[in-house]
Regions:
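Conserved active-site and cofactor/substrate-binding residues in soluble primary-metabolism enzymes
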Residues: 10-13, 17, 37, 75-79, ...
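Short, small-residue-biased leader/transition segments that mark boundaries at the very start
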Residues: 2-9
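Active-site beta-strand/loop microenvironment that shapes enzyme catalytic pockets
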Residues: 54-93
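Conserved phosphate/ATP/ADP-binding segment of small-molecule kinases
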Residues: 10-33
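A structural-propensity feature for long, helix-poor, extended segments
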Residues: 92-134
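Structural signal for terminal/edge beta-strands and the immediately following C-terminal loop/tail
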Residues: 129-160
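Conserved phosphate-donor
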Residues: 25-62, 67
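Short helix/loop capping segments that flank catalytic or ligand/cofactor-binding pockets
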Residues: 4, 81, 134-137
Length: 160
């Protein structure tokens, strides 16, 4: 993809700075998951434009520890749909094509309008293409006393 090799690093660096600043300065309350209180990534996006009545969103998503996702990300596309819906720019049934920095894309649609504990929300659908990048085999030792793993609740990042 032309130009990506020369612009990804600054986008990643700015994205990580924005994510850190958001986590330091902003708060939010998720309507159904009270334990989710951090910003995970930053989506840097061009203004929406339309082709044949379909919204087109070009973005780059900077993820920890400072990489650019190869996809437009389902979370990012869902958030963009919700934001555009809240601003009145998209309505129930409207479609959006989310395109990543390398041109991969998701076909997104607002399927339903919801109320989640008093917060207006949407239920999006996201469709795209996936490729097998590897296969893995997981085995359990029959003598392992913790075959299902373990969790120490006081060691998760939001508790430190």
């Amino acid at each position: 993809v032309t130009g990506v090799q020369t612009c990804a690093l600054p986008i990643s660096e700015v994205g990580m700075k924005i994510t850190r600043a958001a986590n330091e300065q902003l708060t939010f309350k998720h309507p159904t998951n009270p334990d989710w209180r951090h910003f995970s990534f930053t989506q840097i996006a061009k203004p929406i434009f339309y082709e044949d009545g379909v919204a087109i969103s070009h973005n780059a998503v900077a993820i920890q520890p400072g990489k650019i996702d190869r996809s437009p990300t389902g979370t990012g596309c869902s958030a963009r749909l919700a934001l555009l819906h809240a601003k009145g720019e998209l309505k129930l049934g409207d479609r959006m094509i989310g395109r990543s920095i390398i041109g991969s894309h998701f076909d997104c649609k607002i399927e339903e309008e919801l109320d989640l504990n008093g917060t207006k929300a949407i239920r999006p659908s996201i469709a795209g293409q996936a490729w097998i990048t590897g296969t893995y085999e997981h085995r359990l030792d029959p003598t392992d006393p913790y075959p299902l793993g373990y969790k120490l609740s006081d060691t998760w990042p939001n508790k430190l």
